[in-house]
Regions:
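Repetitive helical segments and hydrophobic/amphipathic motifs
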Residues: 23-24
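Bacterial N-terminal signal peptides that target proteins for export
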Residues: 10-19
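C-terminal motif of bacterial Sec signal peptides marking the signal peptidase cleavage site
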Residues: 28-31
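Short, Lys/Arg-enriched N-terminal segments with co-localized hydrophobic residues
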Residues: 1-11
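N-terminal, intrinsically disordered, polar/charged segments of Gram-positive cell-envelope systems
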Residues: 37-85
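Bacterial signal peptide processing site
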Residues: 33-35
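OB-fold single-stranded nucleic acid-binding module
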Residues: 68-290
Length: 290
């Protein structure tokens, strides 16, 4: 009896041990399954997040591209730059462009340098209240109705044009036209914001004592501080007259004072608007001596 009882105890212990091991295995597998599920869930969530991020990035890029693409679409009845240039002188024109700089305002008339992605438009003495003039910060989009005209080679929209402010903004990048100086292609960039690099300052005239000077007040030296500055620069043996238009950049500006400090022989880089007067006569807004 003792032997059987002991045998029975041994058998029961083995069964209990086996049952305990089986339960441990089940729990272990369950835990492992949960862990794998967690990893799978985390991987799925990460993939979903990454996909969402990529989708958002793609959408943002698409939106930006669309904005750039439609930024210069013309409204109904508005000319493209090509159509504007092809229009006859003294004909009515309607254009949309972006203010790049304001030259002056006086007695409800504003003179503006404007540009779109295709070309530039000089607007002379447009009808403009002082209140509206203050709104015409660089980049402002305007729709202009007026008459195309030409004055001493400068194609412009004549005095009396009207405009309305529209939604949109654009600042034109500077275009280096140094290599186009002296070529027939230069005029195709008329009124655009441009750069000239590596030019040499030449004598602009002489002072009262007969000494060569690097600039003149007014084209003939008849002016004084605060008037337009005229100076000559050369490239490849050709000399050109550039101007600091005092209405655009007065005698408190960096460029005005930079030109007053030029020395004959200086090498300079410049930026400004490609104005025309009996030939190229840029209105310079920046001068850097190298």
């Amino acid at each position: 009896m003792r032997h059987k009882a002991q045998e029975w105890r041994i058998i029961m212990k083995k069964k209990t041990l086996a049952l305990t091991m089986a339960m441990a295995l089940v729990l272990s597998l369950a835990a492992c399954g949960n862990s794998n599920a967690d990893v799978a869930a985390e991987s799925t969530a990460a993939a979903t997040t990454e996909a969402a991020t990529e989708a958002a990035t793609t959408e943002a890029a698409t939106t930006e591209a669309s904005t750039e693409a439609v930024a210069d679409e013309k409204s109904e009845g508005v000319m493209t730059y090509e159509e504007y240039m092809a229009a006859d002188l003294d004909s009515e024109v309607v254009i949309e462009a972006y203010v790049q700089a304001k030259q002056s305002w006086w007695e409800d008339k504003a003179t503006l340098y404007t540009q779109d992605q295709d070309g530039a438009y000089f607007i002379y003495n447009a009808v403009c209240s002082e209140e509206d003039y203050a709104k015409l910060v660089p980049g402002t989009k305007i729709k202009v109705t007026g008459y195309k005209t030409e004055w001493s080679g400068e194609v412009e929209i004549a005095e009396g044009a009207t405009f309305e402010i529209e939604d949109g903004s654009y600042i034109a990048p500077v275009t280096d036209v140094t290599d186009l100086l002296g070529t027939d292609d230069l005029i195709n960039y008329q009124n655009q914001f441009v750069a000239f690099k590596g030019m040499t300052v030449e004598a602009a005239g002489q002072d009262a004592d007969g000494n060569d000077v690097a600039f003149l007040y007014n084209w003939d030296g008849s002016g004084e501080d605060g008037n337009d500055l005229y100076f000559n620069v050369s490239l490849n043996g050709q000399t050109y007259t550039f101007t600091v238009e005092s209405y655009l950049c007065d005698n408190t500006t960096d460029v005005y004072n930079a030109v007053k400090n030029l020395k004959i022989g200086d090498t300079v880089d410049m930026e400004g608007f490609l104005y025309w007067y009996e030939g190229v006569n840029p209105h310079i807004t920046s001068v850097t001596v190298k």
